């Protein structure tokens, strides 16, 4: 749950920064309406209960509604949608939610019934959501990866400045707690 929360905090912060770009022709106060955060998770029976609780707190998941079969046919996935204004805080590994005042974020949550791995999740994103949303750019982030406060904006800006770009990747840095881990030579290298 805290890895998921770490990622969502970074994504939410990026959306907030885009909403605060008042002089931008593309972004600004209503920027959140141009961004959809899609979350794809494998296997309903195996999703971390605390992560489910965070998703429920954000309003994009309801426990007990999903069924394995409908009319005798296996269900492939469950899709939930919600625009949340709930914020997330993280202290160490303790996740807490702030019920008011956060920048709105449009969320789509796809919970697959069976484990099909990451590439299948990417296919779900591009083939299912991509066709419906018709996005200008897509940013894929693994749970646990925390995007910098304006890194998604800068990634978008690269595509905006050069429309012939087909793909880009960002830099990943190790999160250190003020150098504490540097005492361990395996971590320091």
Curated annotation (Swiss-Prot):
Protein's UniProt keywords contain Zinc = no
Spell out the InterPro entries in the cross-references.
Answer: Chitin_synth, Chitin_synth_fun
The chain's disulfide connectivity reads: none
| EC identifiers of the protein | 2.4.1.16
Membrane-crossing residues?
A: none
Q: What is its main location?
A: membrane
User: Cellular location of this protein?
Assistant: Cell membrane
What is the official name of this protein in its record? Chitin synthase 1
- In which organism is this protein found? Xylohypha bantiana
- What gene does this protein come from? CHS1
